[in-house]
Each structure stands twice: as C-alpha cells, then as structure tokens.
Amino acid sequence: MQEVSVIIPNYNGMAYLEGVLSSLEQQEFQNFETILVDNGSSDGSVAFTMGNYPWVHIIELPDNFGFSRAVNEGIYAARAPYVLLLNNDTEVKEDFVEEM
C-alpha cells in the first residue's frame, strides 16, 4: 500500500503537466500514488498524461466542477493514509514527498 496520495486537480493545464508529473517521477521516495483529477479539459490533458505518464491514476470529470470538487474526488479515490495536494503548475524537488 502506498504511504502518500498526491492529488493534482487539472483544468486545461496540459502546458503545465509535464513539469509537475516529471518532477514527481524523479522523487527519491517512491511509495506514493499520483491522482490527476481532470475537470473536463478540452486541451488534451488526459491523452497527454495517459500517453506519457501511464503510472498516473486519472479521474475524468465530465465538466469543470471547480477546484474543490476535483480535490474532493481525489481524496475519495486516495488509497494512502496521507494526502498531498499539488497545483498542476507546481514542480517539486526530488525529496519533496519524502520531506513532507
């Protein structure tokens, strides 16, 4: 079981996803899951993530229900006892998850 669930709400943020997901991919601590909650994006965010980061669990909402709903959906799906919330335009250092 993962120790940490990282939740990333997203709406039309494909331009930012490479930064946040690549920085998570480089984490020294590996016992975490990543959940991208997509708020009905029309910019290819979901396809980009599926094609480049197959380890990311994606929750697709049919419309833009807003930040709070996306966060809540991610928390409901989280399988770890600890949750980290990241904006889609965040890039983290390689020890971020471990230090948290």
Pin down the residues of each PLM region.
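Acidic donor-binding/catalytic loop of UDP-sugar-dependent glycosyltransferases
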Residues: 44, 90-100
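A conserved acidic beta->alpha catalytic loop
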Residues: 23, 38-47, 63
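Short aromatic/hydrophobic "clamp" motif used to bind/position activated sugar donors
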Residues: 83
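Short beta-strand/loop segment that forms part of the nucleotide-sugar
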Residues: 31-40, 59-61
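Cell-envelope/extracellular polymer assembly enzymes that use nucleotide-activated donors
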Residues: 2-5, 33
